[in-house]
Amino acid sequence: MIIEGPVIKFGDKIDTDIIIPARYLKYTDPQYLAQHVMEPLDPEFYKKASKGVIIVAGKVFGMGSSREQAAIALKAAGVKAVVAESFARIFYRNAINNGLPVITLPNSTKEIDENSYVKIDVETGEILVGNKVLKGKGITEMALEILQAGGIMEYLKKMQTVNRN
């Protein structure tokens, strides 16, 4: 699975309340949530992301409360993948389960500049930035299957169909 796009960069400790503020959690429409993603840091993020972007961030991206809407809002806004030095474990699982690729890359914010154009091999974790190849951590075969299906629900529907035949 290859994903490519321009980079928007954030720092360390981007928590789920920054990704999607709590006041929007009562809404379930992904497109509505997308309009408010990253609002506390960049009120214009939704417009920038709508063209399809890769977020590059530092340590513990997605920390804080378990908020599935964070991954849903990012994906709906046009975020194709998140590359970070580390992820909060629950955000990592929520992202995969909602079809949003996440790649761990040591020193991510030092290795990749804002507005760079990157090409990511999600399976191997390799990231091409210009003529430089960075080695991130790939994902498991199961996680790749879930991503390729579009998320856990689509994966389960697919498996149910396969098992019926």
Swiss-Prot record:
Q: What is its EC number?
A: 4.2.1.33
Q: Which GO terms describe its biological process?
A: L-leucine biosynthetic process
Q: Name one GO molecular function term.
A: 3-isopropylmalate dehydratase activity
Catalytic reaction annotation: (2R,3S)-3-isopropylmalate = (2S)-2-isopropylmalate
What keywords does the record list, in alphabetical order? Answer: Amino-acid biosynthesis, Branched-chain amino acid biosynthesis, Leucine biosynthesis, Lyase
Which protein family is it in?
Belongs to the LeuD family. LeuD type 2 subfamily.
Q: What is this protein called?
A: 3-isopropylmalate dehydratase small subunit
Question: Could you tell me the gene encoding this protein?
Answer: leuD
Against InterPro entries, the record matches this protein to: Aconitase/3IPM_dehydase_swvl, AconitaseA/IPMdHydase_ssu_swvl, IPMI_Swivel, LeuD, LeuD_type2/HacB/DmdB
Q: In which pathway does it act?
A: Amino-acid biosynthesis; L-leucine biosynthesis; L-leucine from 3-methyl-2-oxobutanoate: step 2/4
List the HAMAP family hit by this protein, alphabetically. LeuD_type2 (MF_01032)
Under the heading CDD domains, the entry gives: IPMI_Swivel
What is the documented function of this protein? Catalyzes the isomerization between 2-isopropylmalate and 3-isopropylmalate, via the formation of 2-isopropylmaleate.
Q: How does it assemble?
A: Heterodimer of LeuC and LeuD.
Organism from which the protein derives = Saccharolobus islandicus (strain Y.N.15.51 / Yellowstone #2)
Q: What class of enzyme is it?
A: lyase
